């Protein structure tokens, strides 16, 4: 190798090491400041701005900018509702109106739309840079879920799109727990468990839109994981709670129990459906399964 080529190689190595060291230094400084002031505290915007000049395509930096704008965008407001449970929460105050009807008051998040859009733009850039980072994709879905307050059309669209991308791509997908950890490769089984968390959250919100999202996500996951008893049981739970169609609920619960006969959660739900139908024979059947 000629001396000129050796110099070029050495320069490239030095530049690479310097860039990595700079990246680590900004991330270290960010984590230290985050521990002291939070996502949007004093000095955070300046640090992120300087970081972005040095590393405009750093996923860690773009996530930091997302959290900064999202935190700045958030506020709270009090909303009156007739329901005794709203978005999975209980009211902080209940009063009676002039007709003697209970009015329940909830404190919920609200968002400044301009700052919320800024937060999403940072995430979109991170997804463009690293499309196979699940944690970044989840952040976008989670942001929409908080913003939409139970009418979760954009949330569902994002999650279903992610399911399609993950299940049809041959790429290795990574997940990073937080800014202090290293990303790891996610298996299909791990991804399935992550989607079960979304199913739970959709169901927990308890709105017509979220129940529909719960059903559609469970059906989509069942199409890929046909032997997973939980997704089949989820479909039964949709019919039990959202439709009050107890016969159809039992049909799916029985399918689920054929795959996993000792699933206590499914057995308990099937028992509820049997009692709703006032079918003592079925009730005894599920009670016996529960005791085994």
Regions found by a protein language model. Give the residues of each.
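Residue at a conserved register position within TPR or TPR-like alpha-solenoid repeats
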Residues: 33-34, 69, 144, 202-205, ...
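Start-of-domain marker
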Residues: 22-80, 108-112
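Short coil turns that delineate tetratricopeptide repeat
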Residues: 55-57, 130-132, 164-168, 225-227, ...
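Short coil/linker segments at helix-helix boundaries
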Residues: 68-125, 129, 139, 146-197, ...
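Alpha-helical adaptor scaffolds
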Residues: 184-251, 255
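Alpha-solenoid helical repeat scaffolds
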Residues: 28, 60-64, 135-142, 172-178, ...
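Hydrophobic/aromatic packing residues within the alpha-helices of TPR/SEL1-like helical repeat arrays
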Residues: 48, 116, 123, 159, ...
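Single-residue signature of alpha-solenoid repeat helices
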Residues: 43-44, 119, 155, 214, ...
């Amino acid at each position: 190798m000629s001396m000129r080529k050796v110099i070029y190689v050495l320069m490239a190595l030095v530049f690479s090491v310097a860039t990595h060291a700079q990246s680590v230094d900004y991330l270290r400084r960010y984590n230290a400041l985050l521990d002291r002031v939070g996502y949007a505290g004093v000095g955070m915007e300046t640090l992120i701005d300087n970081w972005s000049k040095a590393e405009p395509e750093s996923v860690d930096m773009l996530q930091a900018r997302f959290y900064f704008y999202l935190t700045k965008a958030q506020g709270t407001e009090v909303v009156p509702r007739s329901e005794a449970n709203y978005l999975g929460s209980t009211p902080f105050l209940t009063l009676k109106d002039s007709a003697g009807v209970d009015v329940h008051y909830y404190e919920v998040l609200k968002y400044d739309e301009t700052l919320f859009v800024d937060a999403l733009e940072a995430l979109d850039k991170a997804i463009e840079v690293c499309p196979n980072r699940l944690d970044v994709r989840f952040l976008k879905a989670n942001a929409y879920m908080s913003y939409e307050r139970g009418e979760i059309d954009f949330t569902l669209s994002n999650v279903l799109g992610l399911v399609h991308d993950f299940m049809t791509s041959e790429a290795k997908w990574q997940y990073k727990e937080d800014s202090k950890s290293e990303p790891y490769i996610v298996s299909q089984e791990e991804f399935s468990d992550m989607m079960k968390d979304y199913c739970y959250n959709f169901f927990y919100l308890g709105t017509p839109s979220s129940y529909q999202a719960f059903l559609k996500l469970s059906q989509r996951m069942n199409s890929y994981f046909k032997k997973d008893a939980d997704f089949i049981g989820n479909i039964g739970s949709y019919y039990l709670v959202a439709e009050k169609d107890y016969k159809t609920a039992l049909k799916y619960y029985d399918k689920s129990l054929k795959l996993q006969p000792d699933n206590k959660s499914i057995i308990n739900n099937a028992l509820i459906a049997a009692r709703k139908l006032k079918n003592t024979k079925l009730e005894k059947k599920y009670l016996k399964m529960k005791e085994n």
